[in-house]
Amino acid sequence: MTEPRYNGRSFSPDDLAVVAAVLADRSTYPTRAAIGREVCSRLRWLQPDGRLKEMTCSLALRAMERDGLLTLPPPRSQPRRPGPVPLSAASDRQPRITGSRRDLGPIVLRPVADKAENALWRELVARWHYLGFRVQGGAQLRYLAWDAHGRLLAAMDFSASAWKIAARDRLIGWNTDQRMGRLHLVVNQSTFLILPWVKVRFLASSLLGQAVRRLPSDWAARYTYAPVLLESFVDSHRFFGTSYRAAGWRCLGETTGRGRNDRHNRRTHRQPTCWIFIRPLSPGYRSLLRAPLPPRAASAEPPNPAALSPTSRT
């Protein structure tokens, strides 16, 4: 009998018995959040940095309920939709910045450092990116860039990779289990905004190169492991991806328009087709992503991600 699979994990009869035992103890675990946390803990469903995958587990339990496998307690409140990002003078249009890349001096590209910079990042993206601000789930790092004169130039972020990309997955050559066990080692550049008053040739490719050089160590400092591959999607109706090509990213073709998180090939919400770009962060990235998984890797504590990342290789 095929084990049911939810959110990248197969649930064995023993796993389902654990879920049933937690659900039966309503006095100890009265809410959906408490149930999800306890199931996640008992099944050792962990993120690569050792934290519980509470949200992933909760989503899996909701999917099981929709499929008639279990009944959860009613939600205590309805989730609120995020409101518009409040704007301030900090994100107002600034004087035009022109000239050559050299005129900018050394560029500082670094992760946002505090709540104020995070709020500024959100404002800039909401106000000046053509897609606006979108909430990203899972692991992510946001960056801001300044020139040597303290002028703000750009914003970008990196987040969890797309669930499936046919061209990428063919190139890597991994199977479904390997993809589920190693997908965290692929990171998506999900936002790249050069502020519209900044008109400097070769700035975009320069920033991409700087991001590639520092992201592995920044990501490892935040999440205890370093990615081995970057990906990004560029709207093919708006852009050709010239800056990515100039920065050494490889174009794998176009997406089908399904959306980056369409796990079931439903095509219910068509999206614009995009160029698929990748940038290896390790020369052996394909071997690392195809590395054998320990038996029932989803049930056991995951392997030490440092052993799978280029920061640990000599």
What is each residue range found by the language model?
Residues 1-16:
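Basic, amphipathic alpha-helix used for nucleic-acid engagement in HTH/winged-helix/SANT-Myb modules
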Residues 2-4, 20, 74, 81-114:
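Conserved N-terminal entry element of GNAT/NAT acetyltransferase domains
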Residues 56-73:
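Short, basic alpha-helical nucleic acid-contact segments in DNA-binding proteins
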Residues 13-19, 26, 30, 41-60, ...:
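Acyl-donor binding region in acyl/amide transferases
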Residues 294-314:
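Short, cationic low-complexity segments
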Residues 68, 72, 281-294:
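Short, charged low-complexity linker/loop segments at the C-terminal edge of domains
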Residues 35:
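Extended, charge-enriched "interface" segments that sit outside catalytic cores
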